[in-house]
Amino acid sequence: MYGHSAGAQFIHRYMLLSNDYRISNAVIANAGWYTFLNGSNFPYGIKDTPINISSERVRWLMSSKTNLLIGGSDVGLQSLNTSKGAMRQGNNRLERANNYFSSLILLGEENKIPFRWNFHLIKDVAHSNSEMTPAAAKILLADVGDIKL
């Protein structure tokens, strides 16, 4: 499953909030902001979520095969959520991706939860789905064989 920008926001929240365990490989790219697994109010954190998030769900999310991609030049403010809650996550998509990923590493370490996500910085790419898609395809199709894009 692949999502870019708002699509990435949808996928990571769907993986957190749904009861669907069928997602075997997810790539989220250049999300504008995230739902952190912390005490911030929903939707910026998981405090007061519309549904109960079980510890089992958090463990599944953390151990899922998920790849977070971010363009190394995705630092613009175009169509970026600049609300107070979003700005607490970082000043741009690149900072927010780094902060979100780091928060998941820390959560895993503190709670002894296996963390299987990977972080990929796609150099010289800004907020461009067409430039992120080749990297996402290589990840999603890695077990198919030699992929030339």
Region spans (language model):
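Short beta-strand immediately N-terminal to the catalytic nucleophile in serine-hydrolase-like folds
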Residues: 1-3, 29
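Conserved aromatic-histidine-acidic binding/catalytic patches
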Residues: 2, 88-92, 124, 132
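Short, internal active-site loops enriched in acidic
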Residues: 6-8, 73, 123-128
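Short glycine-enriched nucleophile-adjacent loop
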Residues: 8-19, 135-137
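Active-site-proximal flexible loops/turns
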Residues: 12, 37, 130-134
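The feature captures the conserved acid-bearing segment of alpha/beta-hydrolase catalytic domains
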Residues: 24-109
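C-terminal catalytic histidine-bearing segment of alpha/beta-hydrolase fold enzymes
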Residues: 81, 101-149
